[in-house]
Amino acid sequence: MTRKQRRLMLIGVCGAVLAVALGLVLWAMRGTIVFFRSPSEIASQAVAPGVRFRLGGLVQEGSVQRGPDGRVAFVVTDNGATVPVRYQGLLPDLFREGQGVVAEGMLEPGGMFRADTVLAKHDETYMPREVADALKKQGHWQGEAKHPGGTAPAPQTASGEKPALRQQ
């Protein structure tokens, strides 16, 4: 073999090894990739029962029902469609009706979503990106409040005074 043929053979073997390695990594990750869906997407698309995904939206007002042994049932909505959810376990402290939630689990044949994990928003301004995108897509996004003139009000102390700026 000439030097050029050996070099091409080495490049080909390296390319094949990289392709096999990439294939093995993707095959190993196939069970850990979980897609996000909103209630409207579930209603409009046929989601096969038993497929894991994340369901995101708002906890519908008046829908939370707590049962024995830590069982909880509630409804997730995006103001376009609703999906009933069943969960057994401890809910996050910030889980409330009307708040953003992301539940990970699978849809059962009857249309009930069985959640393994429930995540609640952690402060007043945070909403999971997927939930915000789904609400924007449905036209229900209210966004951040705009201040007159397009600027935020000046910060104030508890007594109403404006704090002095520190020089560095």
Swiss-Prot record:
GO terms for biological process: cytochrome complex assembly. InterPro entries: CcmE (IPR004329), CcmE-like_sf (IPR036127), NA-bd_OB-fold (IPR012340). Keywords: Cell inner membrane, Cell membrane, Cytochrome c-type biogenesis, Heme, Iron, Membrane, Metal-binding, Signal-anchor, Transmembrane, Transmembrane helix. Its main location: membrane. Pfam families: CcmE. It is found in: Cell inner membrane. Residues 134-168 are annotated as: Disordered. The chain crosses the membrane at residues 8-28. It is a single-pass type II membrane protein. Belongs to the CcmE/CycJ family. This is Cytochrome c-type biogenesis protein CcmE. The gene is ccmE.
